[in-house]
């Protein structure tokens, strides 16, 4: 038996060498969360959402389908409870000194309770993020059985993620470049006789070759009547003359995403396709003109909605005008749980916020036309993260 076979596997992994950011970036984020915890009377916050865990530590793994819990004390060092198999990944991606791995036959709630007990946290004011997708009702009940009453840490981290730091904006810009590569390849692959699968393969291959990691949600590649049904995507359909093909793509760089919509007319299409696309372009221009400090998220939606309504297209636009972008893991590529551009969202816009602004109009079960940009709020005109022309592509 060699010496390496007897070593703790965790000791063979270097600390933080694959982290997206330096330790100082996470230290500042954790300090901001602690300020919010103290204001809410929380001694220890237990966070289970992969996006918030990544934001505060850099931890990323496709294995987030197993329970992981970042424990942030109001005073003291954080620790991460996770499946033992993932502990090496956490060391590689984070600067956390305290990693608690549990075995596959150990109940996660018991593992978390044991970690808290060992560190003297039982009986203190512990709060969990009740809105996290990966905290099931059953698991929450098990935690209460182990730990007693738990406070609510919902919304503790998300407001801090609204405005992106310069380092975060660099990641989104890199995602935008990879996404442009994917979109260009997808547009080039659209042709009568090609399949939706051909187009999707071109998009994903080019984006990955240009630096994208696995994305939070698959691209949407849909054509013909299928495109008139929201969120249909590739399913082997062969493109035909007269089809409208709609591509919505994203790419990811260090878990930060950028997304984009473009539309293709294959041969001769009905006049209303061109008319509706012109309305989309006008709606996007109106939204982007309002996307600046001094306005609210609701103001941006109202600007786009006014264009839609004025052109008699209200029935085909039953949605928000946009959503925030940044850190994502499946099942979504956006941060729509943080901010939406929609009525009633009276949050003021600030420089550094990033949104995907998709303007889509649907002739239900006939076709869809759509155009979008991922954009950053600045002190002036918004910054876009794509160089691809917005015009309807005509083949």
Label for each model-derived stretch:
Residues 1-395:
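Active-site neighborhoods and metal-handling regions in enzymes and metal-associated proteins
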């Amino acid at each position: 038996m060699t010496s390496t076979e007897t070593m703790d596997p965790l000791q063979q992994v270097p600390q933080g060498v694959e982290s997206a950011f330096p330790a100082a970036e996470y230290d500042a984020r954790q300090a901001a969360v602690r300020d919010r915890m103290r204001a809410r009377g929380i001694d220890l916050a237990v966070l289970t959402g992969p996006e918030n865990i990544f934001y505060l530590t850099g931890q990323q793994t496709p294995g987030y389908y197993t329970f992981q819990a970042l424990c942030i004390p109001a005073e003291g060092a954080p620790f991460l409870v996770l499946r033992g198999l993932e502990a090496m990944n956490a060391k590689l991606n984070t600067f956390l000194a305290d990693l608690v791995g549990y075995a596959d036959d150990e109940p996660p709630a018991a593992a978390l309770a044991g970690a808290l007990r060992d560190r003297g946290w039982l009986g203190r004011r512990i709060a969990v993020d009740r809105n996290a997708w990966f905290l099931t009702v059953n698991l929450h009940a098990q935690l209460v059985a182990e730990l007693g009453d738990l406070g609510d840490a919902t919304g503790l981290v998300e407001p801090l993620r609204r405005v992106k730091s310069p380092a975060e904006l660099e990641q989104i810009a890199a995602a935008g470049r990879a996404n442009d590569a994917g979109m260009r390849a997808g547009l080039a692959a659209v042709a009568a006789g090609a399949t939706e699968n051909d187009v999707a393969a071109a998009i994903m291959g080019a984006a990955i070759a240009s630096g994208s990691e696995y994305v939070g949600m698959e691209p949407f590649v849909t054509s013909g009547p299928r495109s008139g049904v929201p969120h249909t995507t590739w399913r082997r359909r062969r493109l035909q003359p007269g089809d409208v093909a709609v591509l919505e793509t994203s790419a990811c760089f260090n878990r930060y995403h950028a997304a984009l919509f473009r539309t293709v007319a294959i041969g001769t299409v009905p006049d209303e396709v061109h008319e509706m696309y012109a309305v989309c372009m006008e709606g996007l221009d109106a939204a982007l003109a309002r996307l600046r400090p001094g306005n609210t998220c609701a103001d941006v939606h109202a600007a786009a909605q006014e264009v839609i309504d004025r052109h008699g297209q209200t029935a085909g636009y039953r949605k928000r005008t946009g959503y925030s972008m940044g850190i994502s893991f499946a099942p979504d590529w956006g941060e729509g749980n943080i901010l939406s551009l929609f009525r009633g969202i009276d949050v003021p816009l600030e420089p550094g916020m990033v949104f995907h602004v998709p303007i889509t109009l649907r002739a239900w079960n006939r076709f869809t036309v759509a155009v979008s940009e991922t954009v950053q709020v600045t002190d002036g005109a918004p910054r876009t993260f794509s160089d691809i022309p917005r015009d309807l592509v005509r083949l």
